[in-house]
């Protein structure tokens, strides 16, 4: 999360979230790592009663478009996702090779239907527009 910015949490708010792998290294380059992340994403969705409107997992970063959890904050949900995945991936493939994630993440409140459409389009186009 960006330092110094005030966060506004509202139960009806949609959030566009981006977080990156440590040093922007392409750590999602193998199917087992990708599949493990999808399992953790589903765990987060259930635990926090989130609606995931869209997501994309790129080789070195992730974008999510989600609602504000009814009984927690987006920060709580992202923390849970990143921590639970990091613990599981360490035991699966990393074998103590250090951090998986950058420490912070980007969270933008989606203010209206037009911005929602733009952000969802960005999520859908990200794999196509990147050099992958």
What name fits each language-model region?
Residues 1-132:
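Short catalytic/metal-binding and nucleic-acid-binding patches
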């Amino acid at each position: 999360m960006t330092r110094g910015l005030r966060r506004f949490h509202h139960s009806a708010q949609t959030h566009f979230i981006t977080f990156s792998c440590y040093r922007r290294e392409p750590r999602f380059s193998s199917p087992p790592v990708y599949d493990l992340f999808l399992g953790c994403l589903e765990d987060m969705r259930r635990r926090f009663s989130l609606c995931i409107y869209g997501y994309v997992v790129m080789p070195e970063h992730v974008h999510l478009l989600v609602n504000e959890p009814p009984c927690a904050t987006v920060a709580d949900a992202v923390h849970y996702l990143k921590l639970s995945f990091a613990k599981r991936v360490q035991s699966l493939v990393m074998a103590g090779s250090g951090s998986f994630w950058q420490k912070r993440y980007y969270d933008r409140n989606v203010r209206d239907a037009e911005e929602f459409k733009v952000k969802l389009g960005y999520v859908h186009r990200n794999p196509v527009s990147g050099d992958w």
